[in-house]
Amino acid sequence: MKIGVTGSDHICDRIQKTLEKRMPDLEVVYRRSNDYRYGLEAAAQFQKGKVSGIIFTGPTNYHYALKRLEPNVPWTFLPHNQASILK
């Protein structure tokens, strides 16, 4: 399975460390930016790249992209708390 993750460097780093430990067989592609508007471009690239799903690092970049692009794979975002990546 291939998952796309988009968001800030800081949160992507945490997600990457967690997923490498807990789900080493999962293929993850990262698109990093500290500008929430980049989530739209990242989502479009991920969908063209045939990912199975997209994780946004927060609600702002998720909702911004969702208003402008129709998902063709499952999308979700992480709430802003420390344990959210573990759920």
For the regions a protein language model found, what residue spans apply to each?
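Alpha-helical/coil-rich non-catalytic "connector" segments in signaling and regulatory proteins
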Residues: 1-87
